[in-house]
């Protein structure tokens, strides 16, 4: 909307988010249903929780125009693509699976920013030639939003995001819960420095949303969890044995990888 890429932006949400977004000038219109939101749309973007995808795809299939391009923003792809294939029918050939790598621990209209996608990755996961052609069209719009568009196989996507998003979120929630259950929880909240705040930032995200994501990609997440358990066992064992050399070895291995992120 801020970049004048659409003549009209219509949104729908089961709760009040669409109406709040309209009040804040983020939408031109808050629709009363999925069907109303899809009516006359050239582009339909689905940003609902993963468990709701099958039902929403079915509603879109019965209300989208025959030339409307459909995409989604789900954090998992394999199950969402399967749901789309089952529910969209002929409209599946006009669907491009997507995942913008943007956002924060905040959610809702209050977290909206015009520059949210600037210089951020937006992954597209087309499964056939028809979707690949549409992905090129969609990429033009996403690039105009400032995003850097790349394509990726859906199974590779889910394995990668289990590694550096889904499991890390589960781990940070668990760490935060462990601190919260300790006798010094309140003092930890009051006196914690930047290290703890940085480490646990994503633990302030929506618990319901992330439970759905982790369970939807549970096989890949469990593989990551098993590898973490091995690493944690090394750390705990080294601490218990007062083995500084082994502890430094594990810490250095982690530090070398972390430096690559920056």
Cite the ranges covered by each PLM segment.
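NAD(P)-binding Rossmann-fold cofactor-contacting core
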Residues: 5-26
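Rossmann-like NAD(P)(H) cofactor-binding subdomain of soluble oxidoreductases
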Residues: 56-110
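Conserved acidic residues
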Residues: 28, 42, 168
